[in-house]
């Protein structure tokens, strides 16, 4: 009797493994893309889901508003935004913005360089041109309050041509005004 139980157990185990092996080789009706799909791994492109709308100055001309899809990279905060000209699935990626805590930028970026290339998000948000979209009002306010503690730098690299031209400029926030040394150093009380 015990030999029979062992034989049945071995048969069940063998059948199980044979079934598993055959199912991996089975083509069935699954599309080829699904058959070869590896487990989904996290990628740098994931997480750009904070949606912000704001116009920018590009070469001195107000343009946009642009759709920013942003992601927090580090809690300082450090934020990156991919910026598109619309919300359409095939929208053009026209800008990238890097956003850093003022305690980082103000301690490392010389004032003259900051006035040329950076902008203060507290001033931009207070100007009323920035909208945090797709979130309830209380969550949108949390995002705006966090971003108000930062400075941003925007690279604009799409000028509406059919193909890239290699032209690039640093865009600015609408309403940006150069700061004095005292204003720049006194960012915490602003």
What label would you give each PLM region?
Residues 9-17:
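Bacterial N-terminal signal peptides
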Residues 4-5, 15, 27-29:
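Aromatic-enriched hydrophobic runs in primary sequence
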